[in-house]
Amino acid sequence: YSHKIQLCNTKKLLSVNIKMKGKLIVVALILLILYLLPSYPEPIVMRNFLSESERRHIISEATNKLETSTISHNKMVDENIRKSETAWLDKDDKVVRNVINRCLKHTDRPITNCEKLQVLKYKSGGHYKPHQDAFKGDDNMRVHTFIIALNDGYRGGETTFPNLNKSYKLNAGDVLFFDTLDNYNFITSKALHGGKPVE
């Protein structure tokens, strides 16, 4: 009789062990799936990234190069989508090169992979509807974006990430750093961002 009880208990233990193993396998699979899911880091704000003299130099160099901003590679002008002026500064400029090198310390990219410094001027009413900085089929896809505030003292102009429910207001000299792709280097809707109208 005691032997039979022992056998019954053994069967129960085996059943419990099988169930526990089953649960552990399920938990392991869930963790694996979560690990393999695409991830996207939140944008980072770095305060006082540029000095006042650097900001003044960049503004001075860009002033005579400003042109109406266009949309993407199409070179189209549509102020309903984007209203600003753009200038591009060469990396040969010592100040520009120093700023770019400082940015690159937060990435794994060499300066040869970096674009020229894009300077944007937003007047009252200037804005940029939510958009992506990376495009399908682009071999030279932008991987990281640094938005540097060259001045402040205005209302509006926050950088928003609608799919992250995040909004960032920068002071002069601050930089906003974010990835344009997910951890698998695919375009992600989480990187969608825009500039609110300047008042």
Residue ranges and their predicted role:
Residues 15-199:
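Fe(II)/2-oxoglutarate oxygenase catalytic core
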